[in-house]
Regions:
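Surface-exposed beta-strand edges and their flanking turn/coil or helix-capping segments
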Residues: 81, 128-130, 167, 211-213, ...
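Leloir-type glycosyltransferase catalytic cores
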Residues: 226-245
Length: 245
């Protein structure tokens, strides 16, 4: 992200598709980039520990080309570029900005709260797994204690599971239909809510981070990865003011 923030550091687009590797084990990505490195002189920089901030970006030679392997999921990478990033993430399509749901959330008389339930691909990932129900139950209770008149907007890629399994008595609305190329609309809607309960997902992470409410309450899971060893630096994923359960 910090490389994107400065034009002179921008990484050239890689002319190959990685779509076929989606939902595969992480080691497949590793092998793939290792093979490419054998045939190219570009340096491969690997994130050794997920989410741990690496200071190497201040030392790289911007005249050279690099391949970065990892999630680089740490807000410390773009400190000082927050406004630039928010501008880049702001949709320019008025039909999206002024959509019925967006207008409803912005003008709501309630304290709007987004909740993201990420399942689907997480069920077979092996690297990341769905957050347990207790997390959401406890997070909702915290919101009720901190926020008056909350109204919850539910975002999920498994609405049937939510309706059948999450027996929670809260005022809510299920948001569906924004998939594939329109999935970004859900991030926009999350960001327009006053508060956020996120999953262990960069999708809802960005929705909460882009939320510009200065008094927002954001609740995130402590456990981010399926393997406990990978959670060693998971605390660095979220800003310090967010609540981790």
């Amino acid at each position: 992200p910090i490389l994107e923030a400065k034009p002179q550091w921008r990484i050239p687009f890689l002319p190959f598709s990685v779509r076929q590797y989606r939902d595969k084990k992480l080691y497949i990505h590793y092998i793939y980039y290792k093979l490419r490195r054998k045939f190219q002189s570009n340096k491969l920089i690997t994130e050794r520990y997920p989410s741990k901030y690496l200071k190497l970006f201040n030392k790289i030679d911007i005249k050279k080309k690099y391949y970065f392997l990892g999630f680089w999921q740490n807000p410390a990478y773009f400190i000082g570029y927050e406004d630039k990033i928010r501008d880049l993430f702001s949709p320019k399509d008025k039909n999206v900005i002024c959509s019925k749901e967006s207008t409803e959330i912005i003008n709501s008389q309630y304290e709007t709260v987004s909740i993201h339930f990420r399942r689907g691909d997480y069920l077979t990932s092996g690297f990341i797994e769905p957050v347990e129900k207790d997390f959401y139950i406890n997070a909702i209770e915290i919101i009720k204690q901190k926020v008056k008149n909350p109204f919850f907007y539910i975002f999920t890629n498994d609405p049937e599971w939510f309706e059948n399994e999450m027996k929670i008595d809260i005022p809510h609305k299920l948001i569906t239909g924004n998939v594939d190329k329109n999935a970004y609309i859900d991030i926009l809607l999350m960001s327009k809510c006053k508060h956020n309960i996120i999953a262990n997902s960069t999708f809802s992470w960005w929705g909460a981070w882009l939320n510009e409410n200065p008094d927002k309450c954001v609740i995130a899971p402590k456990k981010w990865y399926a393997d406990e060893k990978r959670n060693k630096f998971a605390s660095e994923i979220t800003p310090k003011e967010w609540i981790r359960l």
